[in-house]
Curated annotation (Swiss-Prot):
Positions of the UniProt region annotated as Disordered: 1-29
Phylogenetic lineage: Eukaryota, Viridiplantae, Streptophyta, Embryophyta, Tracheophyta
Keyword Ion transport: yes
Gene3D superfamilies referenced in this protein's UniProt entry, alphabetically: Amino acid/polyamine transporter I
Pfam family, one: SLC12
Native species: Oryza sativa subsp. japonica (Rice)
Alphabetical UniProt keywords: Glycoprotein, Ion transport, Membrane, Potassium, Potassium transport, Symport, Transmembrane, Transmembrane helix, Transport
Protein name: Cation-chloride cotransporter 1
Length: 989
């Protein structure tokens, strides 16, 4: 079809049939949003007049596309009105382009390998709820998640334990990690549209499904466990504020050593602490109540969320006001107000033992140091993913996520550093360590304000965790990578109730543990693992710098991402090497499980780009020079269906892949499986795609490392000639052509096979490709059929050692490892057999090959019949020889009669041939003698390898086929081998 023709109807309404070949095009319509509507190409034209001129034609949807009827407009541009009629229009390209732009990555069929049935519903993404800007969409959620329970009930304790200067180092260290992660997150998030799943989506699309799922599940666990941490923090604060609400009472005796007038004195004090059982009971109740809110859906959560944000900001204001006006008249003695003396006393660290509640105790079971404090404090800087988790609700993700995330990170880090200085100068170390809610004690106007603020802020953070974690799990399940997660799948817009129940179960289990200081290191590991994944993703994408890597956030560099990833790993080991090993082992187990059981997925991840660039670099490093024999690998091109006698649903002979595996040492190497379809490419393109998919499935089923290619050509000879010239790149071109011997040609009366067979062999010789023809492929053993006996080589001509190498490769397989190699040297009558045998033995010894050498002397050619002295083998060969003579004589007579009748020289398949009857008899007799020798010595061999004679020039292909038939007659399993003009083995180390 020409570009101007329309698939649909002409101006007069008469349908225009689409031609059988070629793409189907229609003119550009006004409803086609992917192209520019040109409205001013003529004087006086305008968009209004152009639209008014629209009439008549409703374009038909292309094949394999399901078009949403609601999106089909009633008006399109007719053929005569189209200004871009010359260019034509491919609706498939347009639809795929539109879907790609809206974030639905649909692969456009462009080759037989890409061909899939595409079902597309045309339509714009539905608007889902209000959109938020940078402040409310990213900055505030990040701030709310970062400022959590750790700041209120543990930060003053950390300052008292680590001292001012180590607390500053601690905050800077953890803040640098999250800031660098925020830079990496900003770069990835601004490189395209984001879907649900937050960091899982980013990591999975950058590092692949396996890494994405493994880190995503760990991040899900981190969020679920973080919910329990927030619940415990809220309950602990409530019990501290209202001790009478506890069902169980627990007190701790604190021993303080002081120095008075040079004499050490010890003072004891008894303080009440929340009971573990109270934490468990209230924690489970609060978790269940929060789950009821989560089950109410996003609308209820969005209405409740502001109530948890305002108390956070108000409580911070009250804390700072209280710090600056301290001490008040009723303040404890330990609160000195902002004092330089107190600041100096608290400058250094004073690590000591505490009980499970964090109260100093010389006999306590927990000893704190800087590494342990990193694990305790790091959750106070997490929460930077809150904005990316809400990408679907943002007006402009590529602007809001970088600005909002990094602003929240810098704001909280600056606030933490400022708070270290304030708290270090506010109270004595004893007060910092024993008053678990010092922030409430100093707050203005009353501690109750802080208690309420802490409880509401932590419950809000817990609500966010219980809301985000199920959606993360549902996003992983919806990607359909891990079948075991199918239970958590949800339809678009539905609430993930199953995932919410599972998250609540994990949260309740952690609440039952009841120890906040033991839970936080676990959360830290999972969050650090996720942050390391984000940094590694940006590092890989930045380093590869693929054409698709064009983030709008320009302030990034691969070195910053690498430093961020290393910081994450260092912090993990600083906290606890045992927790680190466990978390990495868990992620590795999930990775292995996904790679083993997960479904295949290609998200265009960075690893694929890395493999591509590595392959290009390796290919360039190989150069165009010949590979040294020490580095030579067989790259077989497997000719799958050369003679066309397999069922249509069988893409390749079942034993060809078994034989291809036998040509590789320990599976190293690559095979190229090729099949040729006779016909016109435009007509058979879809058939080629289907055949390619079937062949790919066959290769995967046979566990053979190889690729499938389907070629459509007018004839098998032309198709093979194209393959042998163009297949492969540089030194990765196939060097061995493997195909089945056409045993069926005479039985099926396929008279075209001889000429095709000869043409293929001649093409291989001209292209300098080795040839391996397998006779008896139906009887070729699989990997479970062990063979015994010998592998016999009939070494007639020098082939660069290919035949010897093939025999050694066969021995490396379990099927043939029990066999021994015998080398038969075919010598003329006047050759010194013993000298030849010694030379061959020395040659094999230098090649590190173990084989028995046998010299067979054949009499010079004499056109006479010999009597058999060895019984059946000679009789079998004799019968085949006589039959071949008779068929050749008949065929030659017919050729002569045809040439005489039509008055032209001897012709075969339209080509002139030269017939020398004496040479024909000589060639035939040589094959007879060789076949007789093979049957005499190697009838029971596991495999026989023999040299392939090249087709004589201008010789009838039918005669050559008769020679080959006589050679392989009655030999059950044979490899006919022809090397090429180079060595594949070497003496040297």
């Amino acid at each position: 079809m020409e570009n101007g023709e329309i698939e649909g109807a002409a101006d007069d309404g008469v349908p225009v049939p689409a031609p059988p070949n070629g793409r189907r095009y229609r003119p550009v319509g006004s409803s086609d949003r992917a192209v520019i509507q040109m409205t001013s190409m003529e004087p006086g034209s305008s968009s209004s007049t152009a639209v008014a001129a629209v009439s008549g034609i409703t374009p038909q949807p292309p094949r394999n596309l399901t078009v949403d009827p609601s999106m089909q407009e009633d008006h399109t541009v007719s053929q005569g009105d189209s200004k871009l009629e010359l260019f034509g229009f491919d609706s498939l390209v347009n639809i795929l382009g539109l879907k790609s732009m809206t974030g639905e990555q649909i692969q456009a069929p462009s080759s037989p390998r890409d061909g899939e049935d595409v079902a597309i519903t045309i339509g714009r993404p539905k608007e889902t709820g209000p959109k938020f800007g940078t402040m409310m969409g990213v900055f505030v959620p990040c701030l709310q998640n970062i400022l959590g329970i750790i700041y209120y009930i543990r930060f003053t304790w950390i300052v008292g334990m680590a001292g001012v200067w180590q607390s500053l180092v601690l905050v800077s260290f953890c803040g640098a990690c999250t800031f660098l992660t925020g830079i990496s997150l900003s770069a990835i998030a601004t490189n395209g549209a984001m879907k649900g799943g937050g960091p899982y989506y980013l990591i999975g699309r950058a590092l692949g499904p396996e890494v994405g799922v493994s880190i995503g599940l760990c991040f899900f666990l981190g969020n679920a466990v973080a919910g329990s941490m927030y619940v415990l923090g809220a309950v602990e604060t409530f019990l501290d504020a209202v001790p009478s609400a506890g069902f169980f009472k627990e007190s701790v005796t604190v021993v303080n050593n002081t120095l008075v007038n040079g004499t050490a004195t010890a003072s004891t004090a008894t303080i009440s602490t929340p009971s573990l059982h109270d934490l468990q009971v209230y924690g489970v109740i609060v978790t269940i109540l929060l789950c009821f809110i989560v089950f109410g859906g996003v609308k209820i959560i969005n209405k409740v969320a502001p109530a948890f944000l305002i108390p956070v900001l108000f409580s911070l204001l009250c804390i700072y006001l209280g710090v600056f006006i301290a001490p008040r008249h009723n303040a404890p003695k330990g609160i000195t107000g902002l004092s330089i003396t107190t600041f100096k006393d608290n400058w250094g660290s004073e690590y000591q033992r505490t009980n499970n509640a964090g109260v100093p105790d010389p006999n306590g079971s927990i000893y704190w140091d800087f590494n342990a404090l990193v694990g305790l404090f790091f959750p106070a800087v997490t929460g930077i993913m809150a904005g990316s988790n809400r990408s679907a609700s943002l007006k402009d993700t590529q602007r809001s996520i970088p600005i909002g995330t990094l602003s929240a990170t810098l704001t909280t880090t600056a606030m933490y550093l400022f708070s270290v200085l304030l708290f270090g100068a506010l109270a004595t170390r004893e007060e910092l360590l024993t008053d678990r809610l010092l922030t409430a004690t100093v707050a203005w106007p009353a501690p109750a304000v802080i208690y309420i603020g802490i409880i509401l802020s932590t419950l809000g953070a817990a609500l966010q965790s219980l809301t985000g974690a199920p959606r993360l799990l549902a996003a992983i399940a919806n990607d359909d990578i891990l079948p075991v997660l199918n239970y958590f799948k949800v339809s678009e817009g539905a609430e993930p109730h199953s995932a919410t129940l599972f998250t609540a179960f994990i949260c309740i289990c952690c609440v039952v543990i009841g120890n906040l200081d033991l839970i936080t290191p676990t959360i830290t590991m999972f969050f650090l693992l996720c942050y390391a994944g984000v940094n590694l993703s940006c590092f890989l994408l930045d380093l590869l710098d693929a054409p698709s890597w064009r983030p709008r956030w320009k302030f990034h560099h691969w070195s910053l991402s690498l430093v961020g990833a290393l910081l994450c790993v260092v912090i993990m080991f600083l906290i606890s090497w045992s927790f680190t090993v466990v978390s990495l082992a868990l992620a590795s187990l999930i990775y292995y499980y996904v790679s083993l059981k997960g479904k295949a997925g290609d998200w265009g991840d960075g690893f694929k780009s890395a493999y591509f660039q590595l392959a290009l670099r390796s290919l360039r490093s190989l150069g165009a020079n010949q590979v040294h024999p020490k580095n030579w690998y067989p790259i077989p091109l497997i000719f799958c269906r050369p003679w066309g006698k397999l069922p249509e649903n069988v893409p390749c002979h079942p034993k060809l892949a078994d034989f291809a595996n036998c040509m590789k040492k320990k599976g190293r190497g690559m095979s190229i499986f090729v099949s040729i379809i006779d016909g016109d490419y435009h007509e058979l393109a879809e058939d080629a795609k289907t055949a390619c998919r079937q062949l790919d499935t066959y290769i995967e089923y046979k566990r053979c490392e190889g690729v499938a290619e389907i070629i459509v050509a007018p004839s098998m000879s032309e198709g093979f000639r194209s393959i042998v010239q163009t297949m492969g790149l540089g030194n990765l071109k196939p060097n061995i052509i493997v195909m089945r011997y056409p045993e069926i040609w005479r039985r099926e009366n396929l008279i075209q096979i001889p000429s095709t067979f000869v043409s293929i062999i001649n093409d291989c010789i001209i292209a300098n490709k080795a040839v391996v023809i397998v006779k008896g492929l139906d009887e070729w053993p699989n990997e479970y059929q062990r063979q015994y006996g010998t592998i016999d080589l009939y070494w007639i001509v020098r082939d660069g050692g290919l035949m010897l190498l093939l025999s050694q490769l066969l021995l490396t397989k379990e099927t043939f490892e029990s066999c021994k190699i015998q080398v038969f040297c075919i010598a003329e009558e006047d050759t010194d057999a013993e000298e030849l045998k010694a030379d061959v033995k020395k040659f094999l010894y230098d090649l590190r090959m173990h084989a028995e050498v046998i010299v067979v002397t054949m009499k010079s050619w004499e056109p006479h019949m010999e009597s058999s002295s060895s019984g059946a083998p000679q009789d079998d060969s004799q019968e085949a020889y006589t039959s071949a003579q008779r068929r050749i004589s008949t065929y030659l007579s017919e050729m002569k009669e045809t040439a005489q009748r039509e008055g032209h020289p001897l012709m075969e398949d339209g080509k002139q041939v030269v017939v020398n009857e004496q040479k024909i008899e000589k060639f035939l007799y040589t094959m007879f003698k060789l076949n007789s020798t093979i049957l005499r010595y190697s009838r029971m061999a596991a495999v026989v390898l023999v040299s392939l004679p090249p087709p004589p020039l201008n010789h009838p292909a039918y005669f050559y086929m008769e020679y080959m038939d006589l050679l392989v007659e009655n030999v059950p399993r044979m490899l006919i081998v022809r090397g090429y003009r180079r060595d594949v083995v070497t003496f040297f180390t």
